[in-house]
Amino acid sequence: MDGEIRVPCSDKIKYEFDLMVMAPETDLRKYQKLGASRLIIHADSIDNQELFLKEITSLKIEWGIAFKTSNDVKKWSDLIQKANFVQLMGIENIGYQGQTFDPRVLDQVNHIKQIKAGAIISVDGGINLETAHELAQIGVTRVVSGSVVFGANNPSVSIEDFKNISNV
């Protein structure tokens, strides 16, 4: 790889990097070089929206914009329109597993659907089989669940249970 540092098997595995960093627009190219095929950028972390859009579109990489439950997604409609997907945080304290799902996300989902019809919407945090089913019914296309899967006696069965929800 000529001295380049990349995540293992990035030529075969699609890696999603969830950038929980300030001013990500200054380093986006670095994450692609590390092997990311998809980036999640938290709206609150962007310092310069114009520079961010210039940099992210130049990379020709799949990207999504993430929002906390306290964010007013309607204020970010321009970014939502341009993003490949939207990720909503189902919890307020980002980075801590095992938290209770925040129902404010349900309103955010509806607002996203009004801003961008057919949007790919992901929810990360507070996800269990019940909340995943509820979210699927209102149009959420992806869920991210850590503690329910990794805390299960058999994580493979837990993953299959989540997959079955998408077939309902």
What would you call each of these model-derived segments?
Residues 1-55:
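N-terminal active-site wall of soluble small-molecule enzyme domains
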Residues 2-6, 28, 49-53, 73-76, ...:
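Generic structural signal for well-ordered alpha-helices
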Residues 13-19, 39-41, 61-67, 86-88, ...:
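Hydrophobic faces of well-ordered beta-strands that scaffold small-molecule active sites
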Residues 23-33, 70-83, 126-143, 157:
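Catalytic cores of alpha/beta
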Residues 31, 86, 112, 124, ...:
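Conserved, mostly hydrophobic/aromatic
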Residues 39-48, 87-97, 138-159:
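Glycine-rich phosphate-binding active-site loops on the catalytic face of alpha/beta enzymes
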Residues 54-56, 136, 150-168:
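C-terminal helical cap(s) of enzyme catalytic domains, especially alpha/beta-barrels
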Residues 69, 77-110, 114-116, 154-161:
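Glycine/Thr-rich beta-alpha phosphate-binding loop at enzyme active sites
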